[in-house]
Amino acid sequence: MSHTDTIVAQATPIGRGGIGILRISGCATKTVAKEILGKLPRARYAEYLAFKDPEGNILDQGIALYFPAPHSFTGEDVLELQGHGGPIILDLLLKAILNLPDVCVRIARPGEFSERAFLNDKLDLVQAEAVADLIDASTEQAARCALHSLKGTFSLRINQLIESLTYLRVYIEASMDFSDEEIDFLSDGKIETQLDRVIHDLDKVRSEARQGQLLREGMKIVIAGRPNVGKSSLLNALTGRETAIVTQIPGTTRDVLREQIQINGMPLHIIDTAGLRETEDPVEKIGIERAWNEIEQADRILFIVDGSTSSEKTIYPLWPEWEARLSRSRLPITLIRNKSDITGEDVALTETEEGTFISLSARTGEGIDLLREHLQQTMGFSGNMEGGFLARRRHLEALENAAQYLLSARQKWSSGNFLSELLAEELRLAQQVLSEITGQVSSNDLLGIIFSSFCIGK
């Protein structure tokens, strides 16, 4: 599809509401306005007008807003029609626009308005992604950080790194251009000092980006264990409500239950699973297989044991089959010794060579705050994101790649035995992957993936 087409889409959620908005962008916007409204509204002024179909029938009445290029969200001529939020009314108005004679207007693809804003230099790629992140924010802190990204906080940090790398490259390439002259650009210590400064600044951005990624995506916590050890009780204790059915009958939970909570602004996706055991029940077997699938994708596993029937404080003596199914080294596990109210164990968190275990009571809630603190610490989430920004996995990957290139450049420099061309190439590669974050360098495939995840009207 061409980026020169005029596009239209509903900018408000599908369904009934007090207000429904259609957004039009492109070169035929003025013609659409004259056909539907009978006039071109005054730029950036709200006008109350009738919305008509091609036969002149009034479909609705509402507010029309016209934003001429380039002073609009997309950088193109944009018209917004704000009418009543009934789906039938909006559908009739949308059909009227699409069926205008001698005017080519099509339905926008998901994220196409934001994509055009990016292509017309109204937003960089980080800011465009922040539009979707602001809409999808699940916590107040995530919304604030998404707004910071939209305002350019993250982009500014990346551009400062790129600018520093540009300075370094100029300095090194100058030494290559004047290699036959009696001018030594590389012996005054500036390269080493500047390179160390860039590496330090990049490390700070990476640390903040990891916090931003946690805030955006949250942490997936899977509650696992044998039947009837208190998994569902722990889910209820963490969420603060009776989310799961709790009985003394083993196998009560047969499917995956999902809930979301917050710890100091960080979203946690808590997943309760079926008790893991050998069974002949075909329905329970399906639930157990789903439990394993969730376990394999977890950021952290809370493996619960009944403290009143077991004295073990690590998972592997309790269940050797666990290690056969999943690798011990890559599984972040916290052992939960439940029912401290029955055993009399002290509510506490203990670190051992085998891992971490917490004694608590899911029934009374004793030790739940300790578990919350533990989850926050294990993910490295500080909770202090004042002035911070959100980040995505692709941002973290680009920052990690840039760090590797810079460390390679630093090692070459420290060895004292290097070619200036190789040093300059490492810096160029670092600069290139950083530029991919903001979209200064990007592939069409990457843009398609990013913008296709947006809602239609954005």
Curated annotation (Swiss-Prot):
Instruction: Indicate which residues the UniProt annotation says bind GTP.
Output: 228-233, 247-253, 272-275, 361-363
> Where are its TM segments located?
none
Among PROSITE patterns, the record links this protein to: G_TRME
Query: Which positions does UniProt annotate for Mg(2+) binding?
Result: 232, 253
Query: Binding of K(+): at which residues?
Result: 228, 247, 249, 252
Q: Which residues form the TrmE-type G domain?
A: 218-380
Q: Name one GO biological process term.
A: tRNA wobble uridine modification
Pfam families (alphabetical): MMR_HSR1, MnmE_helical, TrmE_N
Name of this chain's protein: tRNA modification GTPase MnmE
